[in-house]
């Protein structure tokens, strides 16, 4: 999500907030048809009611290293989140319909892994929680913002964001390569990470997790790196 930083959020409410944030390279601004939007919504519903039981767990990607887009630094690390007032920020700049629909499915107190992406060593660095459910993403209306979408209207906004709050750092960094090793092994054995969205839909910057996936990843904190 782009902008130099995700800034502090306001109090809960339906009105649009003047906040800024960052996105990952995996999110691309796109003028997608209504058909694609509806398809993504159907896929989100399938995740919730069909194949995957979403429970209340997510993985959310952001870039910890500086990268300029239209003169704006896209960097937003977990340390940046910790530095925000109340360690809380909006998660703006998502421009993928399925990822947006996942944001809209989030509920208060849902838990999410903070995942550093598009960097030298990608992986899970910490935990955060949802402290405000989906509301219009202000950056879609800001002409100077890389996430500006001229096709979106204030009375019918296309894009949403949520507010997240830092919970804690992981007891140890869980790198992508370690997760990939487990994913490959679990595909053969039927283990918890056999269908993890991180590997089946890699480009999504907001991803659902089953409780089984979430609990298994948490358990890795207590083990030595594989």
UniProtKB/Swiss-Prot annotation:
Biased composition regions of type Basic and acidic residues, renumbered to the chain: 14-28
Segments of skewed composition (Polar residues): 29-38
InterPro entries, A to Z: 5hmC_binding, EVE_domain, PUA-like_sf, THYN1-like_EVE
Stretch forming the signal peptide: none
Induction (record text): Down-regulated upon induction of apoptosis.
Post-translational modification: Phosphorylated.
Motif (Nuclear localization signal): 5-10
GO CC terms, sorted: nucleus
SUPFAM superfamilies, per database record: PUA domain-like
Keyword Chaperone carried by entry: no
UniProt keyword list: Nucleus, Phosphoprotein
The keyword Nucleus belongs to this UniProt entry's keyword annotation: yes
Tissue specificity note: Expressed in the medulla containing mature thymocytes, but not the cortex having immature thymocytes (at protein level). Abundant expression seen in testis, liver, brain and kidney with lower levels of the expression in thymus, spleen, heart and stomach.
Localization: Nucleus
Region (Disordered): 1-38
Protein's job: Specifically binds 5-hydroxymethylcytosine (5hmC), suggesting that it acts as a specific reader of 5hmC.
UniProt name for this protein: Thymocyte nuclear protein 1
Organism: Mus musculus (Mouse)
Phylogenetic placement of the source organism: Eukaryota, Metazoa, Chordata, Craniata, Vertebrata
Gene label: Thyn1
């Amino acid at each position: 999500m782009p902008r130099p930083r995700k800034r502090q959020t306001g109090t809960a409410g339906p009105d649009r907030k003047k906040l800024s944030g960052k996105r990952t390279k995996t999110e691309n601004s796109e003028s997608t048809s209504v058909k694609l939007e509806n398809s993504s919504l159907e896929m989100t519903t399938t995740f919730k009611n069909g194949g995957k039981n979403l429970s209340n767990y997510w993985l959310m990607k952001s870039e910890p290293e500086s990268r300029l887009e239209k003169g704006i630094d896209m960097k937003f690390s977990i340390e940046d989140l910790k530095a925000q007032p109340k360690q809380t920020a909006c998660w703006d700049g998502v421009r993928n319909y399925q990822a947006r629909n996942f944001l809209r499915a989030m509920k208060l107190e849902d838990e999410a892994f903070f995942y550093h992406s598009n960097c030298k060593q990608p992986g899970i660095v910490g935990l955060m929680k949802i402290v405000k459910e989906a509301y219009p993403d202000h950056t879609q209306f800001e002409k100077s913002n890389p996430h500006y979408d001229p096709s979106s209207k204030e009375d019918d906004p296309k894009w949403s964001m949520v507010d997240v709050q830092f919970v804690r750092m992981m007891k140890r960094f869980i790198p992508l390569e370690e997760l990939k090793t487990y994913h490959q092994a679990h595909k053969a054995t039927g283990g918890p990470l056999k269908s993890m969205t991180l590997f089946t839909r890699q480009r999504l910057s907001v991803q659902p997790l089953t409780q089984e996936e979430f609990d298994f990843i948490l358990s890795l904190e207590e083990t030595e790196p594989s």
